[in-house]
Amino acid sequence: LAAVIAFRDPLLSEGDPEAGFDEHGSAFERLSAFQFGFTDGPSACAAIDMREIGQRRGDLPVLLPEDQTGELPVTEQSVRSIIDAMGIMFSPAKPPPLSFKASEAEGCPDARPSPPASYCPATNTIVVDLDEMKVMGTQADTEDGGLASGDNTAYSVLISRYMQAIQHARGGLVLDNAEAALRTACLTGVATVKMSKTVTTPDGNTIALTAGDVDEAVSGILTNGLAASDVNGESVPSGFSRIDAFRVGVLGDEDRCFKRFA
């Protein structure tokens, strides 16, 4: 799976003359195709054509806007904006408050810390270790190839903790087992797609998914697994299963996640 990600198409801008030619797919698209073949056999592979790819791609951005990197540096303000955007998109009755005191995660009575972002069900609080999140969200040297990395490697983990708050609000769901970890990955995929449409936060900032963000998320899910982990930061051993759960969310909706990972 890591090799499939490493040989993804390069990230291009809208004005790039090579855009749209000789495409081989983003990391997410290539992973999806690999998983189709692995689980469903040759018939699933034969069904992949430009129409199927277009339907699966939907509104996910493929190209970067002109003169933009697609990277939103991790700061306290950007973290607050992501959380605000989640609140607008999912409208929970009791939005989880945000804390930047990393020590608060240590005192949670019903969950262990999972830095750089932790969720405490007892207090319905998301706790962020900003320094660790900055490190996770730093883009590696793209000249060297390898796995995708960048801002959404970190933000996808933050989003996953918000999706645990959404699960907690439903009531009756276990948040500290393998099913919870995969359900979180699935719901993180749902939230990621929702961000393909620009969200304006109360402070006037805009949050939107950019080309390359989904690849950064799946790379993080494969390497550190935190966006596909339970409330204690524990994930399933199989990277294939983690990415598959995220893909189910990207291509589905909340109900599908709750039914699939009950």
Residue ranges and their predicted role:
Residues 102-127, 134-136:
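Catalytic zinc-binding patch centered on the HExxH motif and its immediate surroundings
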